[in-house]
A protein has these predicted regions:
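Cleavable N-terminal export/targeting peptides
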Residues: 1-32
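Short glycine/proline- and aromatic-enriched beta-strand/turn motifs that initiate or cap beta-hairpins
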Residues: 22-70, 190-192, 199-202
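Short loop/turn motifs that connect adjacent beta-strands in outer-membrane beta-barrel proteins
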Residues: 25-36, 69-81, 119-126, 179-183
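Predominantly the C-terminal beta-signal and adjacent terminal strand-loop region
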Residues: 27-34, 86, 153-202
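Residues that define the transmembrane beta-barrel architecture of outer-membrane proteins
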Residues: 35-37, 54-60, 104-110, 124, ...
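Residues on the lipid-exposed face of transmembrane beta-strands in outer-membrane beta-barrel proteins
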Residues: 41-45, 60-66, 87, 110-116, ...
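Sequence/structural signature of outer-membrane beta-barrel proteins
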Residues: 44-50, 69-71, 88-96, 121, ...
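Flexible, solvent-exposed loop segments that connect beta-strands
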Residues: 51, 88-106, 136-166
């Protein structure tokens, strides 16, 4: 199922690029709506950097992106540069093998990224994001901790209320589909997650 979601997301990005090129305004610098901040609530599917096992987590999150350069850094095309701050939460229902449903976990992410937007048309914009993310992982056992429990990735997961903090490089590629100058549907695919949200430009 996860592979199908990723393939569909890639297809959406590819189709958006093809359709946008027909009415491209990428060569018209500054031809995009001005905004002070972009707020984006979204759904989260975390498929990478899972806490101690191979499983997908489902949750919600929020992004706030603030333009740093309104027309640039390349002044000959329609682009801008923003800094983006996020808060994402994902829940993992089970530990996976060998413990299965004996425990579950939660991840909280605090990403800070640079976002480079390319406005291809009045409807479609594409953007890469690169930065760092703080990952806070929590594990909770649903019952008695099994005797065969072992350390995973150097962390003792065999206690109640286990937690761990890590710092990761994060990367997303995204597309926006504008419904108006103030509202857009936004999809991101990258590491560690797939994000589906609605952007509100203020």
């Amino acid at each position: 199922m996860m592979r199908a979601i990723l393939l569909h997301s890639f297809a959406i990005l590819l189709l958006s690029l093809i359709s946008a090129s027909a009415a491209a305004q990428i060569r018209s610098p500054g031809s995009h709506p001005r905004y002070g901040v972009e707020l984006e609530p979204h759904l989260v599917v975390q498929w990478a950097e899972e806490p101690w096992w191979d499983d997908e987590g489902i949750g919600v999150g929020l992004r706030a992106s603030i333009p740093l350069i309104d027309n640039g850094p390349v002044r000959t095309i329609n682009n801008n540069l923003a800094i983006s701050f996020g808060l994402d939460w994902a829940h993992f229902d089970d530990c996976g093998r060998p413990y299965n449903d004996l425990c579950d976990a939660d991840n909280i992410w605090f990403p800070v990224v640079v976002q480079w937007n390319f406005f291809l048309s009045k409807v479609v914009s594409l953007f890469p994001e690169l930065g760092l993310g703080i990952q806070y992982s929590m594990l909770d056992w649903d019952g008695r901790i099994p005797n065969q429990c072992v350390r995973i990735d150097g962390v003792n997961v065999c206690d109640d209320d286990v937690d761990d903090i890590d710092l990761h490089l994060v990367l997303w590629f995204g597309a926006r589909f504008a419904l108006s100058n103030e509202i857009a549907f936004t999809v991101r695919l990258g590491v560690p997650s797939l994000l589906l949200g609605v952007s509100i430009f203020l």
